[in-house]
Regions:
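Proline-rich, low-complexity linker regions of envelope-associated factors in Gram-negative bacteria
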Residues: 24-106, 527
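Structural register within alpha-helical repeat arrays
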Residues: 118, 148-151, 184, 216, ...
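Catalytic glycan-binding domains that act on GlcNAc-containing polysaccharides
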Residues: 142, 149-151, 162-170, 182, ...
């Protein structure tokens, strides 16, 4: 019985073990991959697998031809070298010749265009050595001239005086050449050039800076003309733009020629020009009393701490110094201290001799007067504007108009206003100002019940229809008549041909082709002045428009309009504007275009420091619809 039971158990265990082994084998041991038929293997090796046709599918002649070709491929014997399968040679790929999309330059060869592109790239990285080296390889010398021009105008460059001289003499005439000559003067030195060479240079190119004046003075002294040399050194020292090292150098050189009075005059010049850093460097060289005076002025100018202490240290004899009073006034106006500002203005001498620079004082007077108007203190405002000690310049014109406006609009005194507006009209020349003066004279005579003179001045103002006051004058003089702008001036055809042959015109096109038209601004302004009577302004504005720089065309036309030459086609560009955006009706085109012209001059890339962007100079948040 026991034996029988043992056999049964053994049989069951063996059976279970067999099932488990089979089960594990199926789970763990992967099934062997099926053997592929030789034909199918050849297909895989050859890289060709012929798909089977679906039953009932019609086979076209093209498909049969394809099948035959595939069958031939199938028969290719796969080579073996030392047991390694060598794949079939890949079919040759025929490359289609790409059509060149590079635009040809209008004036330059492909080779020169490439050199120009490289040179400008180096230039924008301030790698002047390589920029000039590459530019010199070009056959067109205008490429090198442009790169060298940009180099010489760059502050802190390493160019020598001879680099400047070579450029000036080779081009004869070029944009901003007066600036290049000014910078050339600052490269002169009796250490590197002989007195004779310097004198000869200034005989041909008169000095334009205080620095050049001093260098010439030194050369004259070394050549024996001591009196004239000392005179030039003293005069140049007052107004020269000097670095810290320049100041130390010239002070050592001219120690026996420069007096303490010369140092005071230079300090005064720097203070009136608001150059407080340069003034600070000068303080140590001043006499004690003047050192205290100009220390106080420097602290007031730079908005530094210790204003009251510095002013208290100024000697009594210098307390009423015009420059000190001016700086104190400016400091108070900036902080909104109206009444204490008036204390200064009403207690100084309103004479040119005392005020030294009445034009500087006017800037603060204007601000004070407008604040007084807001506070309805009209008589004080008139007093501030009318007693100004000015005798000429744009400041005088502004002072006369503001005085006349206050007299007419707030003091109700047209007779007093008339005198101011006439003086304003006689001291201006730009159409925008002439129309303004004429309109307000018309208004003044209208208030005086003098219809004849009123209409006369409105008619005069209506001559300038591109200005705001010109249009207001027209509405007064000819209320029922439409006004028309003058037509574009005629261009001399022969001159136009010579204009476009100008190498500098070629440079403008080159920069446009390189997408660097931002560098054309001063070039276009220069071209505009080439021959105004024959139409250079119009041609320059047209050229600017052709390269897509409406802003530069407007600038050229604006400058022309100041001299009563109106190129309205280019001064007021017209571009299409949508009627609706996102289902919302937008303002009429005339309003949009006028805003664009005023805000960005149609410069697509215009960005303001305040964050305004685009043609209309809108803040992104404001621009959202």
């Amino acid at each position: 019985m026991k034996k029988k039971s043992f056999k049964i158990c053994t049989t069951i265990i063996f059976f279970l073990f067999s099932i488990q082994s089979a089960f594990c084998e199926n789970l763990i041991t992967p099934k062997p991959k099926p053997n592929l038929a030789k034909e199918k293997k050849d297909k895989y090796i050859s890289g060709i697998i012929i798909p089977k046709f679906k039953p009932g599918t019609y086979v076209s002649e093209d498909q049969l031809e394809l099948l035959k070709e595939l069958e031939k491929e199938k028969e290719i014997v796969v080579k073996r070298v030392d047991g390694i399968i060598i794949p079939k040679n890949k079919p040759l790929i025929v490359h289609k010749k790409r059509l060149s999309t590079t635009k040809k330059s209008k004036y330059y060869s492909d080779r020169d265009l490439n050199y120009a592109r490289q040179a400008v790239a180096f230039m924008e990285k301030s790698n002047w050595k390589d920029a000039l080296k590459v530019a010199k390889k070009a056959r067109a010398k205008s490429i090198y001239n442009f790169i060298q021009w940009r180099h010489l105008l760059t502050p802190g460059n390493r160019a020598t005086f001879y680099d400047y001289k070579s450029f000036i003499e080779s081009v004869q005439t070029y944009p901003r050449l007066s600036r290049v000559k000014y910078l050339a003067e600052h490269k002169l030195s009796t250490k590197n050039q002989s007195p004779k060479e310097i004198i000869k240079w200034f005989e041909k190119h008169p000095y334009t800076s205080g620095f050049g004046e001093m260098v010439l003075g030194e050369s004259l002294i070394k050549s024996g003309n001591k009196q004239k040399g000392i005179q030039l050194i003293k005069k140049g020292f007052i107004r020269a733009d000097l670095t810290k090292s320049d100041l130390i150098n010239f002070r050592k050189k001219f120690k026996k020629y420069l007096t303490s009075e010369d140092y005071v005059k230079r300090a005064d010049h720097l203070a009136w020009e608001n150059k407080h850093w340069d003034l600070k460097r000068m303080l140590r060289y001043l006499p004690k009393d003047y050192q205290l005076l100009y220390t106080a002025r420097q602290i007031l100018m730079s908005n530094s701490y210790g204003v009251d202490t510095a002013i208290s240290k100024v000697p009594a004899k210098l307390k009423n110094d015009a420059g000190l009073n001016y700086n104190r006034l400016k400091w108070r106006v900036k902080r909104g201290r109206l009444d204490s500002s008036l204390d200064i203005l009403f207690n100084i001498k309103n004479t040119k001799e005392y005020m030294v620079r009445p034009d500087k004082w006017w800037g603060e007077r204007s601000k004070i007067a407008r604040k007084l108007i807001y506070k309805k203190r009209y008589e004080e405002a008139y007093k501030v504007t009318s007693k100004n000690a000015l005798s000429k310049g744009p400041e005088l014109a502004e002072a006369e108009w503001l005085s006349g406006w206050i007299a007419l609009s707030f003091l109700n005194d047209p007779i007093l206003a008339k005198d101011h507006f006439i003086k304003f009209y006689e001291n201006v020349s730009y159409p925008i100002s002439l129309s303004r003066g004429a309109y307000w004279l018309g208004r003044t005579y209208e208030k005086l019940k003098d219809k004849e003179n009123s209409k006369k001045w409105y008619v005069i103002g209506s001559k300038y229809l591109t200005t705001y006051y010109g249009q207001l004058s027209h509405m007064k003089a000819k209320p029922r008549e439409k006004f028309e702008l003058s037509e574009l001036m005629q261009i001399d055809k022969n001159y136009a041909e010579s204009f476009y042959r100008n190498k500098i015109v070629a440079t403008v096109h080159l920069l446009d082709e390189l997408n660097k038209d931002k560098y054309t601004k001063h070039i276009l302004r220069y071209l505009a002045n080439d021959n105004i009577d024959k139409g250079s302004e119009v041609l320059a504005a047209k050229l600017a428009t052709d390269i897509g720089r409406f802003d530069f065309a407007i600038q050229v036309s604006k400058i022309a309009s100041y001299q009563k030459r109106f190129h309205n086609k280019y001064n007021y560009p017209i571009i299409s504007t949508p009627n609706y955006i996102n289902g919302r009706k937008i303002p009429e085109s005339a309003l949009i275009l006028s805003i664009i012209r005023q805000e960005s001059e149609f410069d697509l890339k215009a960005n303001s420091h305040a964050g305004a962007k685009g043609l209309m100079q809108l803040i992104p948040y404001t621009a959202k619809l």
